[in-house]
Structures are given as C-alpha cells and as structure tokens.
C-alpha cells in the first residue's frame, strides 16, 4: 500500500484560512493559528449578526413609524392599536416605507386608525 503524504491537503487548508483572513490586522492575517481563530470568530459574529439584523431593522421601522405618527398627532402604540381595530394588516416594514416615501398615504392610515379607536381607549373590549 502506498504511503499517504498530507502536505498538499495541509497547505491547501492553510492557504484557504490565510486567504479568508486577508485584510485582518497584524498576526491575524499572517500566522495560521491566529488567522484560524479569527476566521472562526468572524464566522460566529457573522451568524449572530445575521440574526440580530432582523431586530435592528424592526427597531428602525418602529422609530420611523413613531416619528411620522407623532407628526400626524398620534403615538406609535395608538396607531398600531387603531390599525388592528380597523382590521388593516400592514406590516411595520411597509408602514415605515409609507411614512418615509408617501406621507399622504400614511396620513390616511393614521386617520383610519384614529376613527377605529374607541373614544375611551382604556375601556374594556367588547366581547
């Protein structure tokens, strides 16, 4: 049986790690062990931040909706409550897009939400 030499595979693996680490500062781009640690951490950060991005965008959309709602004389939570009472299903992404790019349509939605709210918003819901 022929002897297996692993030099080609080892060099290929190390080269792949060092190429992935190009652009990092100092030893992290030049030494294999440091580069491997940093690439592993980078992949973990990448994975976690892809999950975090969803919440970050939702937070941004809510801030934009709240600012536009307050400009129209209503708060964010009352706007959402009124839209649910009026059975209007518009997600926050689209609401934020309307708030930024189409103020007239957003103002119309605020009007509908205002009319759908009960006069006493703290009154118990009718069953």
UniProtKB/Swiss-Prot annotation:
Family annotation (SUPFAM superfamilies): Ribosomal protein L20
One of the record's GO molecular function terms: rRNA binding
Highest taxon of source: Bacteria
Keyword Nucleotidyltransferase assigned: no
Record-level GO cellular component terms: ribonucleoprotein complex; ribosome
GO-annotated biological processes: ribosomal large subunit assembly; translation
PROSITE patterns: RIBOSOMAL_L20
Pfam families, per the entry: Ribosomal_L20 (PF00453)
Keywords, ordered alphabetically: Ribonucleoprotein, Ribosomal protein, RNA-binding, rRNA-binding
UniProt-listed InterPro entries: Ribosomal_bL20, RIBOSOMAL_L20_CS, Ribosomal_protein_bL20_C
UniProt record similarity statement: Belongs to the bacterial ribosomal protein bL20 family.
Known role: Binds directly to 23S ribosomal RNA and is necessary for the in vitro assembly process of the 50S ribosomal subunit. It is not involved in the protein synthesizing functions of that subunit.
Name by which UniProt lists this protein: Large ribosomal subunit protein bL20
Gene: rplT
């Amino acid at each position: 049986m022929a002897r297996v030499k692993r030099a080609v595979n080892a060099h290929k693996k190390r080269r792949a790690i060092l190429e992935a680490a190009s652009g990092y500062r100092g030893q992290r781009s030049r030494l294999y062990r440091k580069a491997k640690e940093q690439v592993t951490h980078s992949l973990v950060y990448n994975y976690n931040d892809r999950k975090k991005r969803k919440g970050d965008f939702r937070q941004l959309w809510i801030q934009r909706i709240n600012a536009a709602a307050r400009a129209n004389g209503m708060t964010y939570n009352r706007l959402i409550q009124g839209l649910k009472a009026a059975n209007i299903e518009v997600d926050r992404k689209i609401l934020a897009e309307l708030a930024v790019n189409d103020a007239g349509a957003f103002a119309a939605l605020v009007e509908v939400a205002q009319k759908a709210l009960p006069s006493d918003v703290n009154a118990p819901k009718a069953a």
